[in-house]
Amino acid sequence: MRTIKIIQTASQLPEKIVSNDDLAGMMDTSDEWIRSRTGIFKRHIAVDETTASLAASVLQKLLKGSGISADQIDFVLVATMSPDSMAPSTAAQASALAGLSNAFAMDINVACSGFVYGLTLAHGLVNTLGSHYGVVIGAETLSKLVDWQERSTAVLFGDGAAGVLVEAVDGPERLLAADLKTFGKEAKSLTAGHLWSSTTWNQPEKGSRYFQMDGHAVYSFATRQVAASIKRTFEKISADIGDTDYFLLHQANQRIIDKVADLLKQPADRFLSNLSKYGNTSAASIPLLLDEMVTGNIVKSGQLLTLSGFGAGLSVGSIVYKY
């Protein structure tokens, strides 16, 4: 069986930066209130950028950085919960913008768990289809799903995109194990982007196109299920959780990251974070963190990484990867 090797990382952020003080001028909040409850200092917000254009920029950077040509790419997977349109897919639009002609492209919507699901699917694709090069991107413009008068959610989210270019290789396994799980009965704890027909008599609530979240329920789910998912993943391999060099969790809230570290009884400094600069970027958060840490020479070849995402669905997904 072949495995996937990450040979390039890349990211793209919108130009506009919105600080906590900027938000304090728009609603009843403060920099101190946001920092103390979330760990977020600022976020990037798309103005002229779209989900597809951000994803395309990442794709172009991946090609340039790796030296792989556009016609060598076999597949493009884009994890997003904030597409520009229902059809065509963000992956199809990004592929066209980046000049790809031979790749098949598809979107994945598992919200904040999407990048982990995408990497797991990529591992399967190289074996079932014989693909050689593929791209997995997380791209979001969550700002269009935010009610900018609702403090409990408006302070959390940011826009951005990041991803990886993977190569199918023989030899020692790199994606050592995965755990994916969805808890549909808890779906109402986090919703956004409701669509409805103009002929439907029972219209959704006015605000249902925007994020609606039961913060306490999501916090409880995330801390319990991320820790449980990581434990299940390690039960599948001959390694211990403590062998992890770095944990890259979905960047939703610093309190969640700290609590998971505590539940797993692992040192907090192994849990990498860039949440303060970007906020919750959903499917983009893990690859954005990975790219920053690879570029900064924090994550190096040969290290054992544990990636775990959680979010709407409610969903959770974890992988153990030998970088």
Curated annotation (Swiss-Prot):
Keyword Transcription among UniProt keywords: no
One Pfam family of this chain: ACP_syn_III_C
Coiled coil: none
GO-annotated molecular function: 3-oxoacyl-[acyl-carrier-protein] synthase activity; beta-ketoacyl-acyl-carrier-protein synthase III activity
Predominant location category: cytoplasm
EC number annotated for this UniProt entry: 2.3.1.180
Name the UniProt record assigns to this protein: Beta-ketoacyl-[acyl-carrier-protein] synthase III
Organism listed in the record: Oenococcus oeni (strain ATCC BAA-331 / PSU-1)
Gene name per UniProt: fabH
